[in-house]
């Protein structure tokens, strides 16, 4: 019962399996460290992160290998070389059986065998056992991490002492360090968010949204994909519940107040398959930061979408960029005032439709400096828009309606795709080229689309009833003040940082074909009717009048702007534009106004009057 004595002649017991020995003590150390790790997190909650377990265990394993190697080297240097192995073998065998079947695996089991280890060293050849422990720890890491190629075969009892031990230790440390570095490089961003699928909001109890906690991971993928966005639900899950390649994301934007009235820090992801994910961050800074990072990976130049844009191949963009609700987009061709913007005789004409289905056509690029100089020389737009007695009767809302449609950089309801193609026509050489268009998704607002180093950027412009322009955190008295500011100051991009982008030139919108018009010194007739082609989406513009003039009649009030005037001058007549603004365009989607049946003439003393269209009529399909 007390084991064999040194003088006994009994047959030697079989040597226990070294793998079982390693696994036993590894489990004991792991259980002990796990309990202490959990206790440490409870005492220090600041370290309680989703990847805390991985970081702590890696650091523990690295230090374990270093301390283990040094301790084995120290013990082997001081231990005696003459030890009797047979009693030690019997004692260790009984100890292993007792620890396996009788007791729980804890640190006490390890301390129980301290007295036995000194007698075991010669029989077990601890110089080789160090290699076994290293190999066992490496196998445990292989089960948790990605598989790595095996470095060699199982060590034998006849191998050399020091060189294999040091070689295996160095190789294991180097392999784990390189793997960790590669993983950190592949991860672009990681954070804890809440998300829901847009379709799940109505399926919940009472129609409430089903929010879930997740760990969102933006990483560089393999096998051809540039980046992937992965949702880990729950956050500590080892495998993602949803994995989306960024090439399949067609839209990333912050939510509107009407979409999420009770949530301020949310943004939307729209995927090609029709799925929509709404994600919530803890503050506005994280929201804009996530949107900027995702857009930076999907943005033109970083994906197939922008490669097509930069090469002016618009066909590949139809499935990636949000398109206008009007498939057959046609716009009315508005005549643009000459650069001098001098008030001359005006002619009211019938609307002329223009279709811009081929964006690859050659359009003029006009320096913005020329427009601003002309604007300053003419004394501003208020005089040119309010000449005559009738202009004095306009309220501020009516004045705001006259500010966009009259100018060549405004392209109306040009779609997002075609606007991007226009500004990217010259590639990076057209840095700073811009157009202003009506927003497709937000009625009543406009979008500034510009070329940023060969990439198309879209900046939202909000206009109020007084003509004031709001761009992100900046307020301007008018759109022209905004153009002046961004002509000399860089545009603040959502991605932050210093952006060297100023507005340099604009794409001049196409005008209608030249019309013969009435002869000089002849008063221009006022049309009494409007003709609207069926199924056509257009702006109201002015061409040669085809309806006979009507007698003076009582027009509408000053706010309705239904009256129009004309005057005889000695200079050739110039087409004038009707009132058009983002606000009036948005209202037209709900109220389709009927054309006025008549018009009023201006008093004779108004020599330089400016005729305006009766009403704007739109139809959205």
Curated annotation (Swiss-Prot):
Changing residue 437 to A: Abolishes interaction with phosphorylated INSR. GO terms for biological process: actin cytoskeleton organization; antigen receptor-mediated signaling pathway; B cell receptor signaling pathway; B-1 B cell homeostasis; brown fat cell differentiation; cytokine-mediated signaling pathway; insulin receptor signaling pathway; intracellular signal transduction. InterPro entries: PH-like_dom_sf, PH_domain, Phe_ZIP, Phe_ZIP_sf, SH2, SH2_dom_sf, SH2B, SH2B2_SH2. SUPFAM superfamilies: PH domain-like, Phenylalanine zipper, SH2 domain. GO terms for molecular function: identical protein binding; SH2 domain binding; signaling adaptor activity; transmembrane receptor protein tyrosine kinase adaptor activity. PANTHER family: SH2B ADAPTER PROTEIN, SH2B ADAPTER PROTEIN 2. Adapter protein for several members of the tyrosine kinase receptor family. Involved in multiple signaling pathways. Binds to EPOR and suppresses EPO-induced STAT5 activation, possibly through a masking effect on STAT5 docking sites in EPOR. Suppresses PDGF-induced mitogenesis. Involved in stimulation of glucose uptake by insulin. Involved in coupling from immunoreceptor to Ras signaling. Acts as a negative regulator of cytokine signaling in collaboration with CBL. Induces cytoskeletal reorganization and neurite outgrowth in cultured neurons. Phosphorylated on a tyrosine residue by NTRK1, NTRK2, NTRK3 and INSR after stimulation of the receptor by its extracellular ligand. Tyrosine phosphorylated by JAK2, KIT and other kinases activated by B-cell receptor in response to stimulation with cytokines, IL3, IL5, PDGF, IGF1, IGF2, CSF2/GM-CSF and cross-linking of the B-cell receptor complex. This is SH2B adapter protein 2. It comes from Rattus norvegicus. Homodimer. Interacts with KIT/c-KIT, SHC1, EPOR, PDGFR, VAV1 and VAV3. Interacts (via N-terminal region) with SHC1. Interacts (via the phosphorylated C-terminus) with GRB2. Interacts (via its SH2 domain) with EPOR, INSR and KIT. Interacts with GRB2 after B-cell antigen receptor stimulation. Interacts (via PH domain) with VAV3. Interacts with NTRK1, NTRK2 and NTRK3 (phosphorylated); after stimulation of the receptor by its extracellular ligand and subsequent autophosphorylation of the receptor. Binds INSR, GRB2, ASB6 and CAP. Insulin stimulation leads to dissociation of CAP.
